[in-house]
Amino acid sequence: TLATSSAASDVYKRQATSCSKNFGLYRDRVGCAMAVCDTADKHAVVARNMAVLNRMNYSFAPDHGAAVVSIILADKDLHAMWEEELTQMRETMLTIRKDLADELRRQCNTDRFDFIADHRGMFSRLGLGKDEVEALREEHGMYVVGDSRINIAGLSGGRHVPFAAAVAKVLAG
């Protein structure tokens, strides 16, 4: 329940979503609770109740993540598996970055995005303006954070090609 019984009638619509299975984090409280109210007064009541529920459930973060890390780092075989997975992930990210930079160079006919291949990590900012980011979303269904930050990992499996094509079209006007 997202609200106490006295506030339940103030909610026009409520929804709870769990993302635990999506991320494989079954005990980490991954999800969202939402409520829509038809007046500001009702919103205030529901918001207060949801804040209380939030405080009761999330005052202290789960500590089992640290326990899992401790077990992995203390066990020679698990530690080796973890290092191998990190190496594979790092190499995958580098490949995606290179492929994306190459495809953007090809489709946009510019070296403007070559820096992407040299970055490290899961995210990069493309240096696109607000209007370009909006055009990617509205015209091509490509969702990019407002400052043009993209998740490199989300462009695996050849998804960098249509993304680069959309960027090229947006830049071409």
Where are these regions (language model features)?
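Conserved PLP-binding catalytic core of the aspartate aminotransferase-like
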Residues: 81-139
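Catalytic cores of large soluble enzymes that bind and process phosphate-bearing ligands
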Residues: 57, 61, 88, 92, ...
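General beta-strand structural signal in soluble alpha/beta enzymes
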Residues: 15-16, 144
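PLP-dependent enzyme catalytic core of the Aspartate aminotransferase-like
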Residues: 102-106, 128-173
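Conserved core segment of the aminotransferase class I/II
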Residues: 16-18, 22-84
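Single conserved hydrophobic/aromatic residue that forms the stacking wall/gate
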Residues: 1-8, 12
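A structural signal for short secondary-structure junctions
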Residues: 63, 115-118, 144
